């Protein structure tokens, strides 16, 4: 039975919209392609995946064929398949897949072939109208071998080629099943095909009838092109090819790239030629390696002093306190007319945004709303031209955050972005960007990107306060000076608390629940600490405002429940001292019910040790900067607990680094 249009509509909306970015690596050049692609995919393992595959052309012994190998599970399984059945060539594409349509099996792994077996496709994203397309293709006689939406793309390209063949019926040598050439260039067939797709996609395409050619197209999920010395690359993210070249073109939405051994040709979906915009990436390739650490996450925790320093560098004056944001396109005078700020973000970035609310309201004296980007456009928000939108995203490609940005723009708001990737989609639509110079973050659980986001938010809060004229030069200089001291203080924290967190992990790694408490700006850090623990150790953890204990969480407390309480203070800030005193009362509520308390406290606070079971001290800092320091022991505690529990720290189950569709 053929499904009705209504069924198509319903089913197409039931697609799993949380597909993360899969890994794509393509190569064309003089080298053997298999090692290049496999190594590139390995450098993209942080994205999360459950199957892998590769297609290769250019084998001198079989020049008119594409050889394909696939395997479920990790890359080592694919390598084992290749070891048993070797393939050779000088161009090809590889893919690591996160299952959304269909099970994580070899049949559903990419690359996927068309009906002729001569064309292959890899794909990151979701084809929303794949059911309707599939039904139409089946009616034409197409047969499908997988449960995926990606296979549809290969057949759509085949369909475009066959339509041209039909139009040219009678012309010799145009049958794609037997001909050594295509009726139209491969890139033209791809351009025609992508116009029929609804959804998000970044694709790579090879055809046995278009040797030494790799075609890529993008609409939504990220894709980058690499320009080397007589060799060219395609990848879904920079680390996949950074060890070969630093010369990168970020493929834009609506672009099609044709890679050959002589260069890259770029067009839009209509075939109009476009120039390459090659950027030199400053990341050192070694930044994307473990550098001797057991896990990427531990390496990235220890890189936080540099991440904070680099995010601050060049943006503040240590002599005047002035803040400079060179990528700001909003005129300074315009900041006077904004009546409010709306922050939209997801996950860890949302926690950073919630902390940013306290920074911006305290320094710039302007109301701030913080929204989950995934909820924002569905609640009928009412921003206008007096609302400043601030989007926070590590990758710059998070689908929900991009959608929130478009909603803000649609309703007349100007938007700014805090992002870790130069040239990402979020930055291109924004009127200003603060790049978090954290470098590539490989571990799925964010660490250094979070502290860099907190730093960027603090810098922006100062910038906004200065443009609004609500902060004195002396106050600005004080805050800038204190910010400049944070990297050294982070180094102190890393040196002093790692062993202590490791010892605490021995005590608490078998617990089934954790509670994290904080007040004011420390509450978002409690949320982040709980998220880190649940992400990588699979322990249920909850963050809660300490002042809300009487409204429910007290019922959970007994001798089996560890309670992590952020009890830091800035003695020079009366409001900070008041929150600290209130927090001590909350700690006593916990201990009165036999709860076990781990306190994060400020150096010099020895009295708190009389109230709690364990104390982790961090250096003193102004109230608004303490979150950058106090999150580090929470990261390390989560890390050591996860390691003791035998969890995959860098690639937690059911999670991936970036989510590029809803």
Identify what each model region corresponds to.
Residues 271, 297, 596, 621-662:
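Generic C-terminus detector
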Residues 14-295, 299, 303-337, 473, ...:
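Conserved short alpha-helical segments that host acidic/polar catalytic motifs at enzyme active sites
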Residues 333-485, 568-577, 581-614, 637:
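Glycine-rich phosphate-binding loops that contact phosphosugars or nucleotide phosphates
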Residues 304-342, 422, 432-567, 643-662:
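Active-site phosphate/pyrophosphate-binding segments
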Residues 1-20:
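N-terminal amphipathic/basic-hydrophobic helices that include classical n-h-c signal peptides
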Residues 197-231, 509-537, 567-569, 577-584:
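Acidic/histidine-rich
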Residues 94-107, 319-332, 356-392, 398, ...:
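Glycine-rich oxoanion-binding loops at beta->alpha junctions
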């Amino acid at each position: 039975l053929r499904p009705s249009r209504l069924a198509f509509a319903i089913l197409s909306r039931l697609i799993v919209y949380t597909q993360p970015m899969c890994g794509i690596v393509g190569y064309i050049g003089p080298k053997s392609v298999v090692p290049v692609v496999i190594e590139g995919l390995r450098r993209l393992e942080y994205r999360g995946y459950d199957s892998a595959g590769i297609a290769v052309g250019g084998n001198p012994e079989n020049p008119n064929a594409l050889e394909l190998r696939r395997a479920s599970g990790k890359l080592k399984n694919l390598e084992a398949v290749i070891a048993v059945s070797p393939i050779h060539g000088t161009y090809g594409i590889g893919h690591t897949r996160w299952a959304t349509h269909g099970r994580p099996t070899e049949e559903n792994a990419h690359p996927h072939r068309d009906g002729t077996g001569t064309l292959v496709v890899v794909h990151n994203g979701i084809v929303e109208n794949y059911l309707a397309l599939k039904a139409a293709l089946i009616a034409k006689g197409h047969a499908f071998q997988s449960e995926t939406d990606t296979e549809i793309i290969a057949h759509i390209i085949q369909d475009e080629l066959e339509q041209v063949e039909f139009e040219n019926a009678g012309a010799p040598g145009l049958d794609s099943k037997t001909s050594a050439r295509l009726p139209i260039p491969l890139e033209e067939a791809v351009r025609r095909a992508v116009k029929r797709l609804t959804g998000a996609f970044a694709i790579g395409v090879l055809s046995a009838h278009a040797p030494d050619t790799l075609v890529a197209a993008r609409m939504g999920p990220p894709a980058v092109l690499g320009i080397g010395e007589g060799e060219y690359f395609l990848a879904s993210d920079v680390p996949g090819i950074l060890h070969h070249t630093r010369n990168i073109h970020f493929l834009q939405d609506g672009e099609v790239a044709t890679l050959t051994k002589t260069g890259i040709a770029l067009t839009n979906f209509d075939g109009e030629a476009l120039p390459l915009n090659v950027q030199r990436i400053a990341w050192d390739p070694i930044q994307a390696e473990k550098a001797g650490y057991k896990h990427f996450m531990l390496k990235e925790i220890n890189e936080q002093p540099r991440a904070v320093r680099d995010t601050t560098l060049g943006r503040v004056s240590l002599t005047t306190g002035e803040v400079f944001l060179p990528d700001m396109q909003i005129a300074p005078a315009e900041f006077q007319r904004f009546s409010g700020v709306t922050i939209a973000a997801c996950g860890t970035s949302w926690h950073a945004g919630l902390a940013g609310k306290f920074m911006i309201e305290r320094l710039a004296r302007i109301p701030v709303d913080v929204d989950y980007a995934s909820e924002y456009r569905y609640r009928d928000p009412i921003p206008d031209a007096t609302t400043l939108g601030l989007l926070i995203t590590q990758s710059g490609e998070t689908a929900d955050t991009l959608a929130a940005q478009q909603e803000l723009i649609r309703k007349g708001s100007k938007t700014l972005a805090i992002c870790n990737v130069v040239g990402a989609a979020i930055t291109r639509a924004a009127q200003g960007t603060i790049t978090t110079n954290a470098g590539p973050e490989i571990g799925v659980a964010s660490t250094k990107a979070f502290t860099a986001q907190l730093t960027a938010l603090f810098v922006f809060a100062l910038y906004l306060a200065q443009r609004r004229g609500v902060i004195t030069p002396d106050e600005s200089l004080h805050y800038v000076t204190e910010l400049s001291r944070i990297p050294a203080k982070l180094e102190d924290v890393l040196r002093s608390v790692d062993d202590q967190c490791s010892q605490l992990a021995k005590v608490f790694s078998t617990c089934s629940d954790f509670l994290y408490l904080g007040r004011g700006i420390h509450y978002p850090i409690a949320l982040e600490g709980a998220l880190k623990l649940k992400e990588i150790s699979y322990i249920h953890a909850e963050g809660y405002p300490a002042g809300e204990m009487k409204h429910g969480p007290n019922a959970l407390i007994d001798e089996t429940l560890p309670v992590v309480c952020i009890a830091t203070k800035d003695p020079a800030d009366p409001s900070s001292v008041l929150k600290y005193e209130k927090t001590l009362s909350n700690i006593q509520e916990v201990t009165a019910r036999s709860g076990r308390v781990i306190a994060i406290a400020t150096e010099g606070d020895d009295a708190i040790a009389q109230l709690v079971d364990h104390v982790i001290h961090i250096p003193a800092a102004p109230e608004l900067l303490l979150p950058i320091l106090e999150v580090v022991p929470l990261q390390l505690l989560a890390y050591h607990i996860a390691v003791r529990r035998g969890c995959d720290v860098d690639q937690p189950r059911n999670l991936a680094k970036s989510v590029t569709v809803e």
